[in-house]
Amino acid sequence: MATASKESPSENRARLRRAARLSAVQALYQMEIGGLGASAVIREFREHRFGACGEAPEFVEADEDFFESLVAGVVERQADVDPAMDALLADKWRLERLDATVRAILRVGGFELLYRKDVPARVVIDEYIEVANAFFEGAEPKFINAAFDRCARGARPDEF
């Protein structure tokens, strides 16, 4: 893997956004499990989890503004995102029945596919497959891939 000093500006931006996406999924999980609000979790990530690489092992370098836009966007649009994700699931499944981490991935990635048209759909899908692979080794990444593929083809048919 390239180090930050050897990265091109576009590679650096992609790496920082990838970290922001992973952090946004973690933040949504923390909000749900811990019952915390978006402002508190965003503040906690900014103060205790983000930082220059090497400061401390628990710090991660991420695009903090992108992270905040994802978390705040999901919270703001959750009433639209959840039904959209529900519609992609099999008849007997609902978002609330899924694992909390899968739910967080679907919410953040779904928000990005539906409302962040500045990011190509294929990039969004690939990024959240990587996020899913960071958490799961089983069928979950394939399930998430299929859901996002259906979502993207419905929301952005011109990109396929």
UniProtKB/Swiss-Prot annotation:
Involved in transcription antitermination. Required for transcription of ribosomal RNA (rRNA) genes. Binds specifically to the boxA antiterminator sequence of the ribosomal RNA (rrn) operons. PANTHER family: ANTITERMINATION NUSB DOMAIN-CONTAINING PROTEIN, N UTILIZATION SUBSTANCE PROTEIN B-RELATED. One of its GO terms (cellular component) is cytosol. SUPFAM superfamilies: NusB-like. It comes from the Bacteria. GO terms for molecular function: RNA binding. Keywords: RNA-binding, Transcription, Transcription antitermination, Transcription regulation. GO terms for biological process: DNA-templated transcription termination; transcription antitermination. Belongs to the NusB family. HAMAP family: NusB. This is Transcription antitermination protein NusB. It comes from Maricaulis maris (strain MCS10). The keyword Metal-binding does not apply. Gene3D superfamilies: NusB-like (1.10.940.10). It holds the Pfam family NusB.
